[in-house]
């Protein structure tokens, strides 16, 4: 396995100062909990407070777990296990690239899958669960909108006797005051 240091890229430039401080602390052996505990002044969750240097150390030190006894072991090509390839991880707003072997990459992905299943965060179930009741909600919303629209159209004001087209029309009867109309009506 290669002894190359992992590369971390911050494409948005949000953590440039924090990354410099993390690198300085990692080289000196100090901790950088204060610089990685907030992003632009916002407090983050306890899981997100894990520093990138700590994540690198955990991944580099962890070996692949033993394969399950019931699963068939895939045939490996000679020399394939020794070759390391770059693996990119997106975590806490940063991108980290590690040179890991194929076995270690599979172990990391298997561990992430098991953690996701244990917490019930399956991608398909969340999407189906959220949108299962949407057509009924849409129907109720549409019915509410149509009933309010009907009420607005049927409850035209007393000065819109001729309908919506008569609102813009100006005649001699519409420009007179209320008292003048009343006098005309009683005189007739």
UniProtKB/Swiss-Prot annotation:
Q: Which Pfam families match?
A: Jas_motif, tify
Q: How is it modified after translation?
A: Ubiquitinated. Targeted for degradation by the SCF(COI1) E3 ubiquitin ligase-proteasome pathway during jasmonate signaling.
Q: What induces it?
A: By jasmonate, wounding, and cold, drought and salt stresses. Down-regulated by abscisic acid (ABA).
Q: Name one GO cellular component term.
A: nucleus
Which segments show compositional bias classed as Basic and acidic residues?
179-188
PROSITE patterns for this protein: TIFY
Alphabetically list the UniProt keywords. Jasmonic acid signaling pathway, Transcription, Transcription regulation, Ubl conjugation
Q: Which residues form the Tify domain?
A: 80-114
Q: What's in the domain note?
A: The jas domain (135-160) is required for interaction with COI1.
Q: Which family does it belong to?
A: Belongs to the TIFY/JAZ family.
Q: What does this protein do?
A: Repressor of jasmonate responses.
- What is this protein called in UniProt? Protein TIFY 9
């Amino acid at each position: 396995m290669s002894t190359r240091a992992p590369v971390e890229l911050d494409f948005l430039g949000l953590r440039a100062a924090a990354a410099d401080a993390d690198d300085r602390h990692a080289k000196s052996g100090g901790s950088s909990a204060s610089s990685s505990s907030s992003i632009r002044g916002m407090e983050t969750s306890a899981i997100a407070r894990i520093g990138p240097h700590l994540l690198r150390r955990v991944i580099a030190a962890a070996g692949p777990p033993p394969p399950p006894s019931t699963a068939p072991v895939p045939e490996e090509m000679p020399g394939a296990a020794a070759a390391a390839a770059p693996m990119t991880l997106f975590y806490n707003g940063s991108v980290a690239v590690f040179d890991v072997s194929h076995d270690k990459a599979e172990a990391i992905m298997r561990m992430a899958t098991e953690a996701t299943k244990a917490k019930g965060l399956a991608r398909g179930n969340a999407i189906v669960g959220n949108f299962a009741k949407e057509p009924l909600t849409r129907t109720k919303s549409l019915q509410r909108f149509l009933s309010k629209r009907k009420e607005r159209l049927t409850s035209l004001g007393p000065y819109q006797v001729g309908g919506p087209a008569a609102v813009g029309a100006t005649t001699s009867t519409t420009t007179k005051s209320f008292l003048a109309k009343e006098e005309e009506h009683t005189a007739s």
